[in-house]
Amino acid sequence: MKGIDIYSGQGSVDFNAVKESGVEVVYIKATEGLTYTDSTYKDFYDGAKNAGLKIGFYHYLRANDPTSEAEHFFNTISGLSLDCKCAIDVEVTLGQSIDQISSNVRKFADYLINKGLDVCVYTYTNFYKDNLNSTVKDLPLWIAEYGVSKPNIDASYVGFQYSDSGSVNGISGSADLDEFSEGILVGGTVVIDPGQGGDDNIKAIQQDLNILLKRGLEVDGIEGPETEAAIKDFQSIMGLTVDGIWGTNTSGAAQQIFSRPLDGVAYPHYEYATRYIQYRVGASVDGTFGSGTKAKVAAWQSNQGLMADGVVGSATWSKLLDEN
């Protein structure tokens, strides 16, 4: 699908002309940092919506508390109808280390995922290679690289920004030009090419499965039968469609678990985290944290030398994910 991404610097946009030119997807800048809101985001949204274009929003990530930045973005776009994944635009280091940048992206993404939103990461090829680690490479990728027919990256991607100086009917100046797959859409599946060896996305998935299922998969970036079987096992535990594809729902379930939410009878409901806890402690897996699950958690905690309170906090999550 042909796409563009725009912000207030574009000036006025004739969205009907944009659509007639063959564009299907429009990404609109909504926010940046802790407080900045793009002055045209709502006007652009209304215009694109009226023209029948598919709409997504992006946030330009700075070096602040990532949860606060995510909250600012979420509050800004709340109530608006999205066709495409929320994009986290990360492209400057701002004096941060690889781990700091990746942690910020992860926390921003997890905040939105826990709010029920689909997310993707936008960045440049070199930034992706040099400044992001494996903790965020399971997130759908929208990659930018100019002057090439295909980005020079060994990873699956749902979007490719191939120009920042394109010409589009309906926009007076230059525009960013993109090509998107169906994976950019809300609920869209990121299909992994099993013939692509050494894919960083697949390596990240294999690492996640080894942590979650203690499977001992070889982290080789190749989706063979063992990796597919592990994905299916995880999907079954999560109550998802068992198709062996690491799509949005499967990735979202894993991301909720890795966010390590405080979970227990008297705490907010996290279905996927609860299912994982039930699976690990030997409780009936139904996604509801009831008294039976609490008793199983308490017994497991006692066996691990933890305080047996039946509440899954940071110490219990550490045992579940980091040690056992």
From Swiss-Prot:
Q: What is its EC number?
A: 3.2.1.17
In terms of InterPro entries, this protein maps to: Glyco_hydro_25, Glyco_hydro_25_AS, Glyco_hydro_fam25_subgr, Glycoside_hydrolase_SF, Peptidoglycan-bd-like, PGBD-like_sf, PGBDSf
Recorded hits in PROSITE patterns, A to Z, give:
GLYCOSYL_HYDROL_F25_1 (PS00953), GLYCOSYL_HYDROL_F25_2 (PS51904)
Renumbered ranges of sequence repeats: 212-234, 235-254, 255-277, 278-300, 301-324
Per UniProt, the keywords (alphabetical) are:
Antimicrobial, Bacteriolytic enzyme, Cytoplasm, Glycosidase, Hydrolase, Repeat, Secreted
The Swiss-Prot or TrEMBL record describes its family as follows: Belongs to the glycosyl hydrolase 25 family.
Q: What is its main location?
A: secreted
> Which SUPFAM superfamilies has this protein been placed in?
(Trans)glycosidases, PGBD-like
Listed GO biological process terms: carbohydrate catabolic process; cell wall macromolecule catabolic process; defense response to bacterium; killing of cells of another organism; peptidoglycan catabolic process
- Originating gene: lyc
Localization, per the record, is:
Secreted; Cytoplasm
Q: Where is the active site?
A: 5, 91
Name any GO cellular component annotation: extracellular region
Q: Which reactions is this enzyme annotated as catalysing?
A: Hydrolysis of (1->4)-beta-linkages between N-acetylmuramic acid and N-acetyl-D-glucosamine residues in a peptidoglycan and between N-acetyl-D-glucosamine residues in chitodextrins
Q: Which PANTHER family match?
A: LYSOZYME
Species, as recorded: Clostridium acetobutylicum (strain ATCC 824 / DSM 792 / JCM 1419 / IAM 19013 / LMG 5710 / NBRC 13948 / NRRL B-527 / VKM B-1787 / 2291 / W)
* Gene Ontology MF annotations: lysozyme activity
Q: Where is this region: 5 X 23 AA tandem repeats?
A: 212-324
**What quaternary arrangement does the UniProt entry report?**
Monomer.
This protein is called Autolytic lysozyme
